[in-house]
């Protein structure tokens, strides 16, 4: 019982702020009284020192003050003791107050958590009911039942849910609570729809029964003839069953090697071959370009068209010979396969022996650019000396071994 009394006192102190203010006033008054009596005590101690040295020097008031020493000390001690008790009581009350606040906070926290769990569970149930109803409504739209009023009620409830208003929230709450109220503009109650939704999700096919149905479906498929494409077996809406296994609808991607039966071989293109991988492939010679040098130093091109094109290209290159290339001197021959050069030829050893492709727009004097010649002096083309080099099948115009190139006299 004393503990209950202490709890009541702590609750009273906590709930009544006036007592806290009154306690502060009392403590302030006691502190002031203790300070005054402490001064009186110090004054009496000084008078005692004076009386000990010279007792005749004290007057009547001082002697009366010395006579009231005991009363002053007694009152001072009582005030100090009272103040200490008040301080202890205040400390105890503050401790009880903190404990009481902690207890109240814990209770309040538990209540809030309980309310949160309750609200969360309620909201989760409503969301679950809504999702399950949407799944059932989609299935019922594709595979309607034989009950026309029920189908109409499901569609109307679905329209109400899609509105997203307070009416929709109330409809979802009634569906979650399995209310006996009727769906607006229908004769079916929320309880009936909720029970049908529960039955829709409460009866999945067992695994053994599902395997038997799969085996039956494969057994009922007709045999396909050899070479005929595989046809997908369609299932009507009346034969659709609620199952988690995939239906025999969709696209099957098969490699050609995975399809059984005979296959008609496509004719090979001219540049292709249909020889098996384990045999030797014989490539026709007319489809291959042979890059082999012949005895005369020219490349061999099997096809006639390529030879004609090469000759035309060589003629175009020879027609663009620059001015500083001069004809060979017939008097000088070839020594050991190397043409002899005239000693008077200036810079002939530095001249390239291969014609450079120059365009008709690069005419003029020196340098590069529009209407300018190639490297060296003078870019004017000498078109009258087209027979300077022999035409060969080689793509690079090399001088003929029989040509006499001794007189390469550059034009000043």
UniProtKB/Swiss-Prot annotation:
- Region described as Disordered: 1-20, 223-243, 310-412
GO CC annotations?
cytosol
Q: Where is the composition biased (Gly residues)?
A: 361-379
Polar residues composition-biased segments: 1-17, 340-355, 403-412
Cite the record's Low complexity compositional bias ranges: 390-402
**In which domain of life is the source organism classified?**
Eukaryota
Q: Which PANTHER family match?
A: GLYCINE-RICH PROTEIN
Per its record, how is this protein called by name? Uncharacterized protein C12G12.07c
Origin organism lineage: Eukaryota, Fungi, Dikarya, Ascomycota, Taphrinomycotina
């Amino acid at each position: 019982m004393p503990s209950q009394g202490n709890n009541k006192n702590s609750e009273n102190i906590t709930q009544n702020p006036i007592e806290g203010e009154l306690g502060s006033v009392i403590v302030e008054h006691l502190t002031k009284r203790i300070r005054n009596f402490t001064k009186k005590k110090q004054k009496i101690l000084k008078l005692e020192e004076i009386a000990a040295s010279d007792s005749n020097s004290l007057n009547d008031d001082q002697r009366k003050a010395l006579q009231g020493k005991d009363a002053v000390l007694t009152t001072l001690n009582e005030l100090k003791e009272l103040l200490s008790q008040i301080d202890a009581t205040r400390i105890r009350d503050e401790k009880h107050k903190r404990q009481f606040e902690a207890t109240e906070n814990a209770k309040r926290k538990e209540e809030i958590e309980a309310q949160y769990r309750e609200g969360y569970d309620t909201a989760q149930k409503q969301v679950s009911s809504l999702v399950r109803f949407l799944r059932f409504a989609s299935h019922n739209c594709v595979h309607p039942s034989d009950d026309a009023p029920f189908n109409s009620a499901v569609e109307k409830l679905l329209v109400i849910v899609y509105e997203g208003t307070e009416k929709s929230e109330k409809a979802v709450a009634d569906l979650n609570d399995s209310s006996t109220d009727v769906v607006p503009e229908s004769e079916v109650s929320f309880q009936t729809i909720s029970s049908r939704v529960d039955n829709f999700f409460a009866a999945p096919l067992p695994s053994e029964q599902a395997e038997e149905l799969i085996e039956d479906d494969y057994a009922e498929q007709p045999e396909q003839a050899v070479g005929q494409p595989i046809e997908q077996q369609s299932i009507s809406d009346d034969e659709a069953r609620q199952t988690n296994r995939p239906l025999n609808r969709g696209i099957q991607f098969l490699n050609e090697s995975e399809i059984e039966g005979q296959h008609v071989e496509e004719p090979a293109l001219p540049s292709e071959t249909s020889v098996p991988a384990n045999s030797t492939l014989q490539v026709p010679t007319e489809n291959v370009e042979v890059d082999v040098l012949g005895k005369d130093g020219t490349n061999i091109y099997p096809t006639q068209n390529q030879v004609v094109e090469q000759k035309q290209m060589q003629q175009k290159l020879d027609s663009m010979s620059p001015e500083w290339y001069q004809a060979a001197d017939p008097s000088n021959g070839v020594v050991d396969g190397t043409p002899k050069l005239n000693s008077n030829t200036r810079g002939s050893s530095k001249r390239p022996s291969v014609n450079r492709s120059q365009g008709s727009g690069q005419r003029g004097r020196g340098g590069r650019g529009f209407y300018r010649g190639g490297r060296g002096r003078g870019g004017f083309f000498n078109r009258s000396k087209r027979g300077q080099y022999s035409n060969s099948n080689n793509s690079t115009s090399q001088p003929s071994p029989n040509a006499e190139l001794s007189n390469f006299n550059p034009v000043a």
